């Protein structure tokens, strides 16, 4: 019979390390968060062999007093909370007192620290959780923690480490998120002597974004802000033209802590409405400041999952902040820039014959080989080995683009003033709110266009005051019809058109049973089917908005959609129905239209709430400015001075 015993402290720490310290990136995260809590303004992270050989964090924070250094390695010893009430008012990133002892239990840890006003600092060395020495030492104010031979005494953990490149990418990802969370702190990440990431620490979030994503991406991000009595939201989101293939570029922070939250991600997408293409996601860096009492961060070992009170109100604030900022922007993509990116992306490599050329200083100048911009790198498909499949593209972009850090000139640093969330069940009400995006798009200014031609029966050409516009005729009519259907579908108060000859619809037995259950959804959009014999339904009238020639195919399409969905809200059903019908009933490519129809389409487009995107998020029109055209035809050139003018002859 086995007996209950109390585990030795070292074994208990190793068990705790299994939850807190998953990989080298976890060490970096915990130690850097400690440095942030210590009031640091500069943090340097140095790693070797992706952190498995060495992780060293140096900060200029408050430091640790000599008589508290050894205590810091004991479990649940912390300076951040004092009593139970503090657990509900957490303003620091750490609070459990688990990280340092957990790290020390699976590594060789050296800690060098000093506090302001002390005559000397303190050096502590621990191996596998056992303190080997604590001695006075010379040290600047702050703390340096060096973690070596990680997992040396837990070989099973080493067995499951990914490749060094994958582990390094996780570290870059962590540092990037921390840099975005705290733009007032200067972060520097050095791997095997090579600087991988640097932020300026000026307190300007846009500058931190530029240091991580690049200047090109930072320029295409717009500021958002919103607030109520409980929440204050600020940050940046990308314009719809700048997107990524996954959600890894969405960063959410609550009181300076990076979190993952599905519902808030959903709220971000709601704010964009149909301005995003299907399957594409924006870049977003959003800070949320709330009373710590409304957020419970003590629900997960990594503290990345946070329960938020009044989460639905917060979702509404986030989506409104984004929608309001986008409303103020001109969302017509720059055609010349997109063309340049497409050319770079699709260019094929060809074998070139290398001919020896005599270099002439009159015509040639030695230059450094150019590198693709960050935006170009991000748009390439990233191929990973089996060992690196879980690598986030967020970190991969930073890793791949660097040969040396970009040189950015930042303003003089100013101290930033910053303050230090309960998951309800996902119900149909929240889904309804998600689909409000297709019903609240605001009217925008639209250029006056003069139609003058069509190409390949697909694209319309028009001239505006500020250049050339090319319009996708299918996407344009799809947007026009979508807004018509959006307004009319489900308006059961409008008149019904009686049919002289009713339509009979027949379905398989199982489909007929399911349709009977879901018939109220059809009635919500103004379609009333009555049972008529076995597995048959009869339609005696139809809503005015449905053209008579579209009745049979339209009703079957609506029923098919209804049968494919298991649980669906009325708003979702209406939105999807409007999108489906607008797509199927719009003019297709390779279809020529006369000048009158083209001008009428452009007029209808100008009256739309959102004339810039089709319901699937694709652009309706692109814009070449006059300056763009002059650049393409080399009409804009630098001024040249002739040799005669220079007095050479």
UniProtKB/Swiss-Prot annotation:
UniProt GO molecular function: ATP binding; ATP hydrolysis activity; ATP-dependent DNA damage sensor activity; mismatched DNA binding
GO BP term, pick one: mismatch repair
Entries under PROSITE patterns matching the protein: DNA_MISMATCH_REPAIR_1 (PS00058)
SUPFAM superfamilies from the UniProt entry: ATPase domain of HSP90 chaperone/DNA topoisomerase II/histidine kinase, DNA mismatch repair protein MutL, Ribosomal protein S5 domain 2-like
GO CC annotations, alphabetized: mismatch repair complex
Keywords from the named record: DNA damage, DNA repair
A Pfam family this chain is assigned to: HATPase_c_3
InterPro entries (alphabetical): DNA_mismatch_repair_CS, DNA_mismatch_repair_MutL, DNA_mismatch_S5_2-like, HATPase_C_sf, MutL/Mlh/PMS, MutL/Mlh/Pms-like, MutL_C, MutL_C_dimsub
NCBIfam families reported for this sequence: mutl (TIGR00585), PRK00095.1-3 (NF000950)
Family: Belongs to the DNA mismatch repair MutL/HexB family.
Record-linked HAMAP family: DNA_mis_repair
Function description: This protein is involved in the repair of mismatches in DNA. It is required for dam-dependent methyl-directed DNA mismatch repair. May act as a 'molecular matchmaker', a protein that promotes the formation of a stable complex between two or more DNA-binding proteins in an ATP-dependent manner without itself being part of a final effector complex.
Protein name, as recorded: DNA mismatch repair protein MutL
Protein encoded by which gene: mutL
């Amino acid at each position: 019979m086995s007996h209950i015993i109390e585990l030795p402290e070292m074994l208990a720490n190793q068990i705790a390390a299994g939850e807190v310290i998953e990989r080298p990136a976890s060490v970096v995260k915990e130690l850097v968060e400690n440095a942030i809590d210590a009031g640091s303004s500069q943090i340097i992270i140095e790693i070797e062999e992706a952190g498995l050989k060495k992780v060293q964090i140096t900060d200029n924070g408050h430091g640790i007093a000599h008589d508290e250094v050894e205590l810091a390695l004991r479990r649940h010893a912390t300076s951040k909370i004092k009593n139970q009430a503090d657990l509900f008012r957490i303003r620091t990133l750490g609070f459990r007192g688990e990280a340092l002892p957990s790290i020390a239990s699976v590594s060789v840890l050296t800690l060098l620290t000093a506090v302001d006003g002390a005559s000397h600092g303190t050096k502590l060395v621990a191996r596998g959780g056992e303190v080997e020495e604590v001695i006075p030492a010379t040290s600047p104010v702050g703390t340096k923690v060096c973690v070596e031979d990680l997992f040396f005494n837990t070989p099973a953990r080493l067995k499951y480490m990914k490749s060094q490149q994958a582990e390094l990418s996780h570290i870059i990802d962590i540092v990037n998120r921390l840099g975005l969370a705290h733009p007032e702190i200067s972060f520097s990440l050095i791997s095997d002597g090579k600087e991988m990431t640097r932020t300026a620490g000026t307190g300007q979030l846009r500058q931190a974004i530029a240091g991580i994503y690049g200047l090109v991406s930072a320029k295409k991000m717009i500021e958002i802000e919103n607030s109520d009595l409980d929440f204050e939201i600020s940050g940046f989101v990308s314009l719809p033209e700048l997107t990524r293939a996954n959600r890894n570029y969405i960063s959410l922070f609550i009181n300076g802590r990076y979190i993952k939250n599905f519902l808030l991600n959903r709220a971000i997408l709601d704010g964009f409405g149909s301005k995003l293409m299907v399957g594409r996601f924006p870049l977003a860096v959003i800070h949320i400041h709330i009373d710590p009492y409304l957020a419970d961060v003590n629900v997960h070992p990594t503290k990345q999952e946070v329960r938020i009170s009044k989460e639905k109100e917060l979702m509404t604030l986030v989506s409104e902040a984004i929608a309001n900022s986008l409303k103020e922007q001109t969302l017509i993509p720059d055609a010349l820039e997109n063309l340049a990116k497409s050319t770079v992306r699709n260019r094929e490599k060809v074998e070139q014959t290398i001919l020896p050329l005599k270099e002439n200083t009159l015509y040639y100048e030695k230059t450094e080989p150019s590198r693709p911009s960050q935006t170009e790198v991000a748009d390439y498909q990233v191929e990973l080995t089996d060992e690196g499949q879980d690598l986030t593209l967020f970190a991969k972009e930073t890793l791949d683009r660097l040969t040396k850090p970009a040189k950015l000139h930042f303003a003089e640093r100013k101290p930033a003033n910053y303050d230090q969330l309960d998951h309800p069940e996902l119900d149909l009400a929240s889904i309804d709110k998600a689909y409000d995006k297709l019903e609240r798009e605001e009217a925008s200014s639209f250029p006056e266009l003069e139609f003058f031609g069509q190409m390949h029966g697909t694209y319309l050409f028009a001239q505006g005051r500020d250049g050339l516009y090319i319009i996708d005729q299918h996407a344009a009519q799809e947007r026009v019809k979508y807004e018509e259907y959006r307004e009319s579908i489900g308006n059961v108060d409008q008149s019904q058109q009686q049919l002289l000859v009713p339509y009979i619809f027949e379905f398989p037995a199982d489909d007929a049973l399911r349709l009977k259950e879901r018939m109220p959804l059809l009635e919500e959009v103004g379609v009333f089917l009555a049972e008529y014999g076995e597995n048959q339904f009869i339609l005696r009238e139809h809503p005015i908005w449905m053209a008579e020639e579209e009745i049979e195919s339209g009703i079957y399409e609506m029923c098919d959609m209804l049968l494919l969905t298991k649980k669906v809200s009325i708003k979702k059903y209406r939105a999807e129905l409007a999108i489906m019908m607008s797509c199927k009933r719009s003019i297709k490519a390779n279809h020529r239209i006369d000048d009158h129809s083209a001008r009428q389409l452009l007029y209808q487009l100008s009256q739309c709430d959102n004339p810039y995107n089709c319901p699937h998020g694709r652009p309706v029109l692109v814009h070449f400015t006059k300056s763009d055209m002059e650049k393409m035809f080399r009409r804009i050139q630098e001024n040249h001075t002739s040799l005669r003018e220079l007095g050479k002859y």
